[in-house]
């Protein structure tokens, strides 16, 4: 404990995996024992690289180091490139060399990303997401030429994390069918793409562009996707950078406005399947990455707040001993634990079924979970980082005291990436109407209830079952076709369904692992989510914080009788 800040010790970023017991428990839950042991070994080695990357990330975020456009070389030849700080280039190269594309499972890949993204470097994690999506679509649908000429470069440390995806134009962003960029086929089978791309994050060497081939219909049915390199024969590929956007956050990540003026590219997949392929191979993968990044920023914010609260003394007591501080930490930890649990359960399912399983219901359920996780991990992220900042008081808003001010700015950007909240919720409800969602959801809830025996969190179980009943009453099979109802209540019902799945997952894990801490977090969320704005007055977790609050928010084992929970 410290009254004087001169003896304050920053949070330890050298053991982001080893000091995350909740994440270790989760991996043991979603993986078998042998795989969990293997992942522990892999991630223990991975975490040792993070302190150096964290230091490089902090240096790259300095205002004088931010990316800049270099349009010409010293004798006036066009370059049309973005110059990155050497620290960013070093992290990217070392991340590839360390094996970010060499994994035995999706759980392994995104466990690495969850730890990596805690350094708060959007200039690495965004291009990683874009490059991953571009690799997957070229592997699945690319021509032999693309696989031979460009796939090795996308995977290499020579061109580290150099992929990007440019969809948005002034005419449309989330409304992909409104884009106006065109593509004309050349005699050699390549295409000439002309487009004014308005939001080009991670501009580097290789791009996936959405454009409309000549003669294609309007709307999304006429959109195709193309592979476009920055350079052809060492010269700029008929493209021009207008400027880099002056964004609120992720300032170390260049986001450009780019004019493509007959740029040479190659069709990826069939042109009539362009929108389908864009959604399934590019946007879905980016949304998975976005969820992992959101969880990482959420975790880093919690770690920073917990570390500060455990040292800072005010009014004669350590901050962490104050009930209101414990409640702040509890709110951040509970939301993180629940959403992280559902996210890694999704990844474990992808490992079993594959991304885009052949069976239609499985594929649509997977897409439902991907969209749900992108939305749920991001929609309160800014609020969670702000809650962590407020634990610091005025020290929380000082740029060089902690990473939190940068995380706050970046969190708002992460919320907007790959579909704002309203768009995602409406997409979720459109997808619900395309398969027997209600039977599948009922099956998932049934598994939760069946594994939740009487005598365990009885009060919470009663509240949970009532919330299930309420969902069945509000969200009937007829609702997805009611456009007015959907447009009005999309976010409310999606949040309610998500609460049921996230809390239920916590209960199942807590029961399976005999983990009181997880069960208490589940009880807390049950009361807070389903009992209304005054739930805290009757919430048994809040009432019992004097008994176990310190252990709970410190992620230590919690002992005791949970009767009345």
Residue ranges and their predicted role:
Residues 451-565:
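C-terminal amphipathic alpha-helical interaction region
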Residues 234-236, 242, 257-286, 303-320, ...:
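A glycine-rich, basic-preceded beta-loop-alpha segment at the flavin cofactor/substrate interface
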Residues 190, 194-238:
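A short core secondary-structure module
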Residues 250-280, 394-418:
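Flexible glycine/proline-rich, aromatic-decorated loop/lid segments
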